[in-house]
Each structure stands twice: as C-alpha cells, then as structure tokens.
Amino acid sequence: APSLVGSEMCIRDSFKKYQYLSFVMSKEILKKVRQIEIRTKNIVNDFFGGDYHSNFKGRGMTFSEVREYVPGDDVRSIDWNVTARTGKPHLKIFEEERELSVLILIDVSSSGVFGSKKNLKIDLGVEIAAMLSFSAIKNNDKVGLALFSDKVEKYIPPKKGKKHVLRLITDIVNHDFENSNKRTSIKTAIDFANKISKRKSVIFLISDFIDDNFWNELKFLNFKHDVIGLQIYDAYERNFPNLGIINIHDSETGENTWIDTTSKKIRDKFQKNSIEKLNSFSKKCKNIGFDLIQISTDDDYIKFLMQFFRSRANRS
C-alpha cells in the first residue's frame, strides 16, 4: 500500500509539473504569436497592403446582372437577346471576381533551424508567412498553409478572417523544429499543392531550396497557378567571417565537418561557392518564368518584398 500511495503522489506531482510546463509553453507561444501579429500587421497597414493588392486581382470577371441601357454605357456590353425580347436596350453587367485563394508552403526541414546572426532561417520564414497571411485577409482573400519537409507535415485549408490567420501563425510557432535530420523535398510540396489547388491560386513557396530535384513539377505548378518563391539564406553564406576552427553540422544528413576559417583561401572558396549556387538557382528560375525573391537573414526583407511586388505590378 505505501508504495502505491507513493506512486500516486509521484504521478500527481508529475502531472502538476506537466500542467505547469504546458501552461508556461502556451504562454510563451501566445506571446510569440502576439509579437508576430503586431509586427506584421503594422507592416501590412503601413507599407505593404497596396503593393499586395496591385499584384493579385482576382480570377477574372463574373456575371452580375442585366439592366437597362443608359446614355454613356458601353454599347459593346449590350445583351441583344434581352434587348430583342423586351424591345428596350439592356446591358450585361460583369464584376471582377475579387476573391483569391492563397496557399503558403513553408519548408520546416532541419536546414531551416540555422542562423548565424539575429534570425534563424525559419524565424524569418515564419514572419514573412504571417505578413503574407495578413495581407491576404486584408485583401478579402482566403489563405491556407502547408508545412513540409520530405513529407507534408501539416495542412490547414484556406479560409478568411483574423482568427484563422492567428491559428496559422500559432501552428507554425508551435511546430517541432528541433526534431533532427528532417530532409527537404520541394517536389513533395509542389505535388501536394497541385493536388489540392483545383482553381487558379496564388502560391508562396518559402524555403532555402537546398533540394534541387523539382524543376519539371515546378514548371507545371507555375503554369497552372501564380507561384512565387522566397529563398531564405543565412548572412554567412554570402560573407563568411573568420571564426577560427569550427565544426559545421549538416542538420539534414547529420554529418559534421571541421573547417579552418582562419584561412582566407578557404573562406573565399566557401563564399564563392555559396554565391554561385544562389546565382545559378536564380538563373534557373528566370529561365522557366518562376518569380523568385532571395532574402538573407540580415536583409531588410520588407524593402525587398516591396521592390519585388512593385516591379511585378509594373510588368503586368
């Protein structure tokens, strides 16, 4: 009996600790979600909303009503069948089908849990996803989310409203990014987007794009939908500093490599390879007509996005 009582007390204590830890974790998550909400909503309201709106204008025109012709109306819109039947000229009125469906695909593989300065790659990805989500609902669009690594880990179908967007952000923040050795499969994310997006949609693909086996699938997705890639890379990939002898861990393969960064020759080679990879990827995207934004973890991403969307609006 004493041992049973002791076990009960131990279980009760463990449960209380679990409840306390859950409460603390929930508070931390809510705090982080709130911080992201305040920052990204302010960006949307102050800078970004108009640029988003001018880029995404709905699926086209849809029939609204038939009404009598009044002087000044466009005669090309006359409905001759109704005009003949009533003996009075009537017009067919069309309205822009404004509502869009937006899907945000976020790479949550292990390579995103890296950051040499203030941001992890995934942290920047989450903030950009939140900003795009608030832009979508401000535009009266539906927005959905898919988290992927080498499989689709979570999918939330597109809906409207602030509560829905806060749920999206909470689910991203609450995701287990520390689970080691999650690999990247862009092809898996693209195949999933093709499968679930029946009507033309706006699709944002946020990743570091370390995987390179998806070009045919991307061409097809880009043909059917309005797809924009956001490639997030770390600041050290562009400008590698002298950090002494360091151990570099590949979070997707689990491999470790020692590098002597005191050698300028090694630093220059690393930097040259990284820049060549970024430039080569950008060129491939351009060749298939895929819109790409490349953003470093220490860049002012708001400025980059605004420049991109303004340039894109001028093209259309």
Question: At which residue positions do the language-model features occur?
Answer:
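Single conserved hydrophobic/aromatic residue that forms the stacking wall/gate
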Residues: A1-D13
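Von Willebrand factor
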Residues: H164-S201, N213-F214, D234
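Short beta->alpha connector loops
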Residues: R85-T86, F209-N213
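Acidic beta-strand-to-loop metal/phosphate-binding motif
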Residues: V202-D208
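An amphipathic, basic-hydrophobic helix/alpha-beta surface used to engage anionic
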Residues: Y18, S22-I156, V202
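Von Willebrand factor type A / integrin I
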Residues: F23-F56, E65, D74, F192-R199, ...
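Hydrophobic/aromatic beta-strand patches that form the interior of the parallel beta-sheet core
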Residues: L103, A146, F204, I228-L230, ...
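Residues immediately flanking
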Residues: V108, F209, I232
